[in-house]
């Protein structure tokens, strides 16, 4: 596999990527996940996004580089994971997914896990 694109910052390490993908999988089961760059953009604009996950191996990467700018405007943490195929599998679809958004739900069963991962992503951004 080639080196990840240098524009894909901050890139999660293997351990954090696994935690993120686990939370993504649980959020997909609880209908708390939006898949794709367009739907992720919509959640940011509506203010219902907890954090954004993007694939670092997206080609061309420019098709999702509007998301970090929007995230910074809306004060939402974001992170890149190494593989779009792994992100697609975690989202529960058979196709690669280049971006996903975990949405807000205060009554969620995985609220604590979402906040734990969100804190780790925020420390990457510092």
Curated annotation (Swiss-Prot):
InterPro entries per record: eL8/uL1-like, H/ACA_rnp_Nhp2-like, Ribosomal_eL30-like_sf, Ribosomal_eL8-like_CS, Ribosomal_eL8/eL30/eS12/Gad45, Ribosomal_eL8/Nhp2
PROSITE patterns, A to Z: RIBOSOMAL_L7AE
Record localization: Nucleus, Nucleolus
GO cellular component terms given for this protein: box C/D methylation guide snoRNP complex; nucleolus; small-subunit processome; spliceosomal complex; U4/U6 x U5 tri-snRNP complex
Keyword line: mRNA processing, mRNA splicing, Nucleus, Ribonucleoprotein, Ribosome biogenesis, RNA-binding, rRNA processing, Spliceosome
GO terms classed as biological process: box C/D sno(s)RNA 3'-end processing; maturation of SSU-rRNA from tricistronic rRNA transcript (SSU-rRNA, 5.8S rRNA, LSU-rRNA); mRNA splicing, via spliceosome; snoRNA guided rRNA 2'-O-methylation
A GO MF term: U4 snRNA binding
Stated role: Common component of the spliceosome and rRNA processing machinery. In association with the spliceosomal U4/U6.U5 tri-snRNP particle, required for splicing of pre-mRNA. In association with box C/D snoRNPs, required for processing of pre-ribosomal RNA (rRNA) and site-specific 2'-O-methylation of substrate RNAs. Essential for the accumulation and stability of U4 snRNA, U6 snRNA, and box C/D snoRNAs.
Family: Belongs to the eukaryotic ribosomal protein eL8 family.
Subunit structure: Component of the U3 snoRNP particle. Binds to the C'/D and B/C motifs in U3 snoRNA. Component of the 25S U4/U6.U5 tri-snRNP particle, a subcomplex of the spliceosome. Binds to the 5' stem-loop of U4 snRNA.
Protein name: 13 kDa ribonucleoprotein-associated protein
Species this chain originates from: Candida glabrata (strain ATCC 2001 / BCRC 20586 / JCM 3761 / NBRC 0622 / NRRL Y-65 / CBS 138)
This protein's encoding gene: SNU13
């Amino acid at each position: 596999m080639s080196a990840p694109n240098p524009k894909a910052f901050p890139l999660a390490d293997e351990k954090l990527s696994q935690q993120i993908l686990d939370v993504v999988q649980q959020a997909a089961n609880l209908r708390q996940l939006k898949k794709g760059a367009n739907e992720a953009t919509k959640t940011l604009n509506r203010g219902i996004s907890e954090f954004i996950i993007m694939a670092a191996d997206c080609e061309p990467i420019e098709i999702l580089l509007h998301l970090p700018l929007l995230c910074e405007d809306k004060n939402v943490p974001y992170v890149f994971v190494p593989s779009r195929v792994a992100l697609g599998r975690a989202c529960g679809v058979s196709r690669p997914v280049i971006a996903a958004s975990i949405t807000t739900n205060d009554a969620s069963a995985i609220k604590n896990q979402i906040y734990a991962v969100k804190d780790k992503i925020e420390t990457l951004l510092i």
